[in-house]
């Protein structure tokens, strides 16, 4: 069977892996010059490892991607260090990645810290998220944490992540999933995520699949014979089935044959973009903290400062100390228009708040990465709004991170989504009468 896949990120490659292993003729179309999607990386000439453009890590609970890695025989190439995550309060950073750390956090009274611990324990132990999607995270957390703890700790994080305009939108099931799945140890692949993606792509092409890089799909049409025509700028070809892993808006734009109701579902899904500045410094910026959570109202020009080399040794990056300055923003935000030099002028002065001795001469090199589609916004009762993977067009499937729910988007659930779509294709066409 001829199967097309749009997108060579974790979802698309996972689907291609399963379908090529089943003997199908698979063609993957990818608009970017490399595989990996949002998990793709880059490499300076003097580095031993690649580095993710947008910071990534795995949790020890990420069964889908760790299971795939085990299938491939690469488990010995996965590392799980335990870095330090910190919360900003009153000009200082405090560890905030364990029950003991929360009890020591000075930003709220001790009784509220205990209350936070009880709520976190409840969220970790309760198995059902469905009742939680009926209420906003703002309302639920304010009620059960109490106003002091919520205003100090979690409201600034929610506003930073989704924006003030979405504070009354994001549902509590999303927050439950963040707590439920989180582990203190964070995983990565030796050599970086790009090495993993490249190795997976080689396995897929060794089975006869084709991966066409730098080839964005311009249109999908259903034909009278039941096949699907996939058009690129260079050519067009017919396929028996197609799995698209692109953004909902792009899916709607390139597939005019979708019914109006399904297209409306696609266009209703809200999401934010990501802007990430990566800096290579000649020395360590902070004293061992990996992830710095920054409340928006504290005046930082970005949401998170991640000192990657407090997690992975700078020896893998030629001695460079790697710092990410990142934010989730509406694609209309000025950060998507400003030049790298203009953003550096906004970002670099803020680094003095992490280290008063910081000097911009410490910066050896910088890179700017932007994506207009990076973070879905899950609204109240979001499960009712998610488009089905199996679209109303026969043989056409849609598997994107906007359908990952209630879990937060990431490579683990992208793998799960891609393999689920591949299984649907196999099952549907086994009957020779796909829906």
Can you say where each PLM-predicted feature lies in the sequence?
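Glycine-rich FAD pyrophosphate-binding loop
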Residues: 20-45
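Conserved Rossmann-like nucleotide-cofactor binding loop
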Residues: 11, 34, 249
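Short loop/edge segments at beta-strand edges and connector loops
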Residues: 7, 80-82, 213-215, 221, ...
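N-terminal Rossmann-like FAD-binding beta1-loop-alpha1 element of flavoenzymes
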Residues: 2-28
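Conserved flavin/dinucleotide-binding core of flavoenzymes
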Residues: 305-435
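Mid-domain catalytic core of redox enzymes
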Residues: 22, 218-323, 328-337, 341, ...
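Active-site/ligand-binding neighborhood in enzyme catalytic cores
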Residues: 108, 117-220
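Dinucleotide-binding Rossmann-like beta1-alpha1 core, especially the glycine-rich loop
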Residues: 46-131, 143
């Amino acid at each position: 069977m001829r199967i097309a896949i749009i997108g060579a990120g974790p979802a698309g490659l996972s689907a291609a892996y399963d379908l090529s292993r089943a003997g199908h003729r698979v063609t993957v179309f990818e608009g970017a010059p490399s595989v990996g999607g949002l998990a793709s990386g880059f490499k300076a000439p003097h580095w031993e490892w690649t580095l993710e453009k947008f910071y990534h890590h795995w949790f020890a609970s990420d069964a889908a991607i760790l299971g795939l890695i085990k299938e491939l025989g690469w488990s010995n190439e996965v590392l799980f260090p335990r870095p330090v995550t910190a919360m900003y309060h009153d000009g200082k950073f405090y560890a905030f990645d364990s029950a003991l750390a929360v009890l020591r956090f000075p930003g709220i009274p001790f009784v509220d810290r205990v209350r936070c611990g009880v709520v976190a324990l409840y969220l970790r132990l309760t198995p059902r998220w469905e009742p939680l999607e009926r209420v906003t995270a703002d309302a639920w957390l304010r009620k059960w944490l109490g106003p002091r703890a919520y205003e100090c700790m979690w409201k600034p994080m929610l506003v930073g992540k989704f924006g003030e305009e979405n504070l009354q939108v994001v549902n509590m099931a999303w927050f439950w999933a963040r707590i439920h799945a989180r582990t203190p140890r964070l995983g990565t692949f030796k050599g970086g995520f790009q090495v993993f993606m490249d190795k997976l792509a080689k396995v897929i092409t060794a089975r006869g699949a084709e991966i066409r890089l730098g080839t964005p799909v311009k249109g999908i049409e259903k034909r009278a014979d039941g096949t699907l025509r996939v058009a690129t700028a260079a050519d067009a070809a017919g396929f028996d089935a197609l799995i698209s892993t692109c953004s909902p808006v792009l899916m709607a734009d390139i597939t005019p044959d979708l019914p109006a109701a399904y297209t409306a579902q696609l266009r209703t899904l809200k999401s934010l973009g990501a802007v990430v500045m990566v800096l290579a410094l000649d020395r360590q910026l902070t004293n061992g903290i990996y992830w710095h959570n920054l409340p928006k109202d504290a005046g930082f020009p970005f949401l998170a400062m991640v000192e990657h080399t407090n997690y992975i040794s700078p020896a893998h990056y030629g001695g460079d100390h790697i710092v990410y300055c990142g934010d989730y923003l509406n694609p209309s935000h000025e950060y998507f228009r400003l030049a790298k030099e203009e953003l550096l002028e906004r970002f670099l002065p803020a680094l003095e708040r992490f280290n008063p001795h910081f000097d911009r001469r410490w910066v050896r090199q910088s890179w700017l990465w932007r994506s207009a589609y990076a973070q879905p916004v899950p609204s109240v009762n979001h499960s009712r709004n998610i488009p089905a993977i199996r679209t109303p067009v026969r043989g056409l499937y849609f598997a994107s991170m906007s359908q990952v729910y209630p879990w937060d988007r990431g490579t683990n659930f992208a793998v799960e989504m891609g393999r689920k779509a591949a299984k649907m294709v196999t099952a549907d066409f086994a009957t020779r009468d796909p829906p």
